[in-house]
Amino acid sequence: MSGTLVLVRHGQSDWNLKNLFTGWRDPDLTELGIEEAKAGGKALADYGIKFDIAFTSVLIRAQRTCQLVLDAVGQSSLETIRDQALNERDYGDLSGLNKDDARAKWGEEQVHIWRRSYDVPPPGGESLRDTGARVWPYYLTDILPRVLSGEKVLVAAHGNSLRSLVMVLDKLTKEQILKLNLATGVPMVYKLNADSTVASKEVLGDMSGAH
Ligand SMILES: O=C(O)[C@H](O)COP(=O)(O)O
């Protein structure tokens, strides 16, 4: 067994609350989002983990979540690397639109395909495959080597940038990834084998309400 990789999706953002497609736009956390991030941090504190390094995106909602988790585990000053590679999927022309308005305009089915399919990009934006094509190389070069050297690594990022990672880690098919939604602020704790495959996965919270 080598190190530990913890993935956590940012807490509820202002645009999650307003039901807007967000992508690379940069809203902050809501009060609930702050509480969710703190709760995820408390779950990790109770789990007893101490991190060696943290990674997050260049977007404020993930950075704030990362800091709130680190505060909760008593590691407020831990080195944190911010990289655009971990950003949310770029929602292209949908960014800033209301998700219900988009359903009314393009239909429930089409919007679901844009939101959850593997390889159909929203207009002007990234498919999950496109997102994975930048998340996965960054994971391989910057994150995985640290985990394999035995470090405990926190990654605070986004619903779809993390779905693209989880798809590979959990060996999900294109059909299975369609159904996977990650809850805000719920940490997933992966222990990896020396060959980088997953030895164990624990979810510290409830993923069932995610949509
Ligand atoms: O970018 C967004 O709108 C959200 O962070 C994730 O949206 P989704 O649930 O539609 O993928």
Curated annotation (Swiss-Prot):
Pfam families: His_Phos_1. InterPro entries: His_Pase_superF_clade-1, His_PPase_superfam, PG/BPGM_mutase_AS, Phosphogly_mut1. GO terms for biological process: gluconeogenesis; glycolytic process. The keyword Isomerase applies. The record marks H158 as: Transition state stabilizer. It catalyses: (2R)-2-phosphoglycerate = (2R)-3-phosphoglycerate. Its EC number is 5.4.2.11. GO terms for molecular function: phosphoglycerate mutase activity. Substrate binds at residues 9-16, 22-23, 61, 88-91, 99, 115-116, 159-160. CDD domains: HP_PGM_like. Keywords: Gluconeogenesis, Glycolysis, Isomerase. Homodimer. NCBIfam families: pgm_1, PRK01295.1. This is 2,3-bisphosphoglycerate-dependent phosphoglycerate mutase. It comes from Rhizobium meliloti (strain 1021) (Ensifer meliloti). The gene is gpmA.
